[in-house]
Amino acid sequence: MADAETFAFQAEINQLLSLIINTFYSNKEIFLRELISNSSDALDKIRFESLTDKSKLDGQPELFIHIIPDKTNNTLTIIDSGIGMTKADLVNNLGTIARSGTKEFMEALAAGADVSMIGQFGVGFYSAYLVADKVVVTTKHNDDEQYVWESQAGGSFTVTRDTSGEALGRGTKMVLYLKEDQMEYIEERRLKDLVKKHSEFISYPISLWIEKTIEKEISDDEEEEEKKDEEGKVEEVDEEKEKEEKKKKKIKEVSHEWDLVNKQKPIWMRKPEEINKEEYAAFYKSLSNDWEEHLAVKHFSVEGQLEFKAILFVPKRAPFDLFDTKKKPNNIKLYVRRVFIMDNCEDIIPEYLGFVKGIVDSEDLPLNISRETLQQNKILKVIRKNLVKKCLELFFEIAENKEDYNKFYEAFSKNLKLGIHEDSQNRTKIAELLRYHSTKSGDELTSLKDYVTRMKEGQNDIFYITGESKKAVENSPFLEKLKKKGIEVLYMVDAIDEYAIGQLKEFEGKKLVSATKEGLKLDETEDEKKKKEELKEKFEGLCKVIKDVLGDKVEKVIVSDRVVDSPCCLVTGEYGWTANMERIMKAQALRDSSMGGYMSSKKTMEINPENSIMDELRKRADADKNDKSVKDLVLLLFETALLTSGFSLDEPNTFGSRIHRMLKLGLSIDDDDVVEADADMPPLEDDADAEGSKMEEVD
């Protein structure tokens, strides 16, 4: 062998290894699933490359996974004829470059997650150290020579060019030197059970090197020959007698052979009624690397002009990187006539359904399809349309069980709202799946459909309020009149609600109306209308004074018919941003600031004529519109209204000073008196004297 090069593990990987080695995990068996899954991925890659270039398979035409237990040396070997690794791949992928999931996986482990999640974070290879204290990887890639990677996980690993080992042709061979207490993993029965449990549905043959003992019957002719030689004489015997006396002898002969473990045909080729829940769960786990079972499954086939079979799964919880834009989703595996084509096919399902896992096997797509031609492919567009339809059907099936749907909605509500924003064709269908808290729903969530059935007589619109949290909006001044009239209001407190509701203008013919925007119209009796007109007239002067004081801060000041208890509130234009949307946009680091100028619409101040503060303010303003206290109070009211209406203050310090001034007034403290009192006090001669005099006073 050539000289070995030594490399240090990247710090995070080193941490991960010490965590895997030094912590007790009960389900160490998952290591085999992870290593077989890696082999399957490597085989997928070479098979895909060979579709366009057959010569890629010359080094090793067969595609397989072999498992060899060795009781003599206490090793377990896993060999695949996959794509193999170059020297650079070995160094980077197995030690020096941490994947994005390394840190997240360690954090998840620290938070009590199961070690079997390791595959979801892309660091499944290191699970080998759950059962082995030394791992040797020999690999051959078509573009490089054969190399050996070796490590006992002590902070470093070596890579050596393999000049003397057995030539692989192409692929990877992993030898695990098992720990003394992990010898169960060289037992044939145990290995077979593990492959059946976790890797039954891998689409390549997984063969186990098994020991076979055969009993052979042999006649004892040879023994007789030996005896004759020893005695040196031949006894004459009757032939018949000789035949009778000839005995048959049994001997045990040991042989080895490959035994195919995953004999099942692809699960999606079988009829749904023939498959039980456990089989679906096993297939889901092998497909997704999830340690939990799925929440729901949809197994269907489409026939006619276009033929394909598919199985779709909804997980129980959202993955840690659900909305990671850098990560390509690889949740739907695409097969063509049972041949795996690709697993991060972005065009097969819209982004908002990126959490759905599964497989699609098409009869019509060409085998040599590439990503570039896939985008233009009409067949794929039809498959995509069908998948979206079936996903939505599946969600409605989940919704039939309230408990399951609550789990689903908690994990994936953002995806549904993203669907409202992006998928105009299915918008009305997705809207039926939305759930919100409301002024009448208590701790339960309500659907838009249920809201419509509870609407009051004569109510034509669906009312909602957006905000930062349920707590922030449930006592909002915007809801006062609506609550008084017994009208239900939906709380939309997810940041993405603002975007979704911008697209969902109505539901079942009922317009969605924001309680925080101008133009809120509620049914009024003749008496109410008359009273409103009188109050408008009465408060006209105050409205003008407030507008003069606030200037450009507000567009107009009007008498409100939406606030009942609060003195005032600030509403936004019907087509501009709400206060909540303004908050969201300000929080975006890469926002287009020019857009904020025209989208954050001018505010309208609505005053409550029946509030005692407003009534007193009106009297003062009518008496003297230049009264300084009126100006101060108007500014204070405006700033508090900004806060209660969900806006942020541009000058919090000024607001703080105003509050302090009001506190002093309330406590009858005069600033001038405080200054004078300080001036009258004689300077202290000495600290010690001061302390002494204090002591004398106590005496």
From Swiss-Prot:
Residues 219-228, 676-690 have a biased composition (Acidic residues). Pfam families: HATPase_c_3, HSP90. Residues 219-248, 676-699 are annotated as: Disordered. A motif (TPR repeat-binding) lies at residues 695-699. The keyword Repeat does not apply. Keywords: ATP-binding, Chaperone, Cytoplasm, Immunity, Innate immunity, Nucleotide-binding, Phosphoprotein, Plant defense, Stress response. This is Heat shock protein 90-3. It comes from Arabidopsis thaliana. The lineage of its organism: Eukaryota, Viridiplantae, Streptophyta, Embryophyta, Tracheophyta. The gene is HSP90-3.
